[in-house]
Design a protein with these regions (language model features):
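C-terminal regulatory or interaction extensions
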Residues: 1-253
Length: 253
């Protein structure tokens, strides 16, 4: 078993940070404590509801939990050197684990991954840390959608996998690529839930007013141009079009 490291930085770069060794109680015994530790160090925002002020976490706690669990379960224990690591920046959190994914990163949602650490996965399921194989990323995506965060970025390096969860960002500050990635994540999540991706659902995802439906159409077009989604039935009129992930056509065929 490799020890989990947690590093918190002062800003958005790695210039200056305090490293904390975590996981001394083991993955199962220390999982709850690690969640509490992260929860206490992540930023919160003050909101007002019914005249009452309260603080709400910037990052959805359920997404953090699933990303930590995935990082532990899917690490490659045969890779030497560093173990799982969580890095906290002012604008993002990075979760890094040894090893590269056993499936295409575009299929993290909707495809059951082969088990790399069967005994560890079964144990963590038995103690209530993880659930059915392949369901973690659906929960992460659902939380990202609910909180209208940018889509997580998955980076595969030579012997490591890194998932970046971004802090909330106004639609106007998201790049074209980030918007297309969010459209793709939305489309995949709805596809595996047997729901349609439409202009209406995209407007709801990004908080776009009904009178600005053309803006939602541009987002869908950009995602298609990027090769991420397809029109389900090209014979259907523009207003009634439904969209699916690019890989769904090959899957049906």
């Amino acid at each position: 078993r490799k020890t989990i490291r947690v590093v918190q930085y002062d800003g958005s770069s790695r210039a200056g940070g305090n490293e904390i060794q975590a996981g001394s109680r083991g993955y199962a015994g220390g999982f709850s404590g690690l969640q509490d530790y992260l929860h206490a160090r992540l930023p919160s925002a003050e909101i007002v509801e019914s005249g009452l002020r309260r603080h709400q976490q910037v990052y959805p706690q359920r997404a953090i939990r699933e990303l930590v669990a995935n990082m532990l379960i899917h690490q490659d224990l045969s890779v030497g050197g560093s173990g799982p690591m969580v890095e906290i920046f002012s604008n993002r959190i990075e979760f890094t684990n040894p090893g590269v994914p056993l499936i295409d990163v575009r299929r993290f949602i909707g495809q059951r991954p082969p088990s790399r650490n069967e005994a560890l996965a079964l144990f963590m399921t038995r103690v209530g840390i993880s659930e059915e194989r392949g369901s973690g990323w659906e929960k992460i995506a659902a939380e990202v959608e609910l909180h209208q965060l940018p889509a997580p970025r998955i980076t595969v390096e030579s012997d490591h996998t890194k998932v970046t969860l971004f802090a909330p960002r106004p639609f106007s500050e998201m790049s074209k690529t980030e918007r297309s990635e969010a459209v793709y994540l939305h489309t995949v999540l709805r596809f595996v839930s047997s729901e349609a991706t439409t202009n209406t659902s995209i407007r709801a995802r990004f908080g776009i007013a009904e009178q600005n439906s053309a803006q939602a159409s541009r987002l869908l077009t950009d995602a298609m141009d990027a090769g991420l989604i397809l029109i389900e039935d090209v014979s259907v009129g523009t207003r009634l079009r439904r969209y699916v992930p690019f890989w769904s056509v090959a899957e049906v065929a």
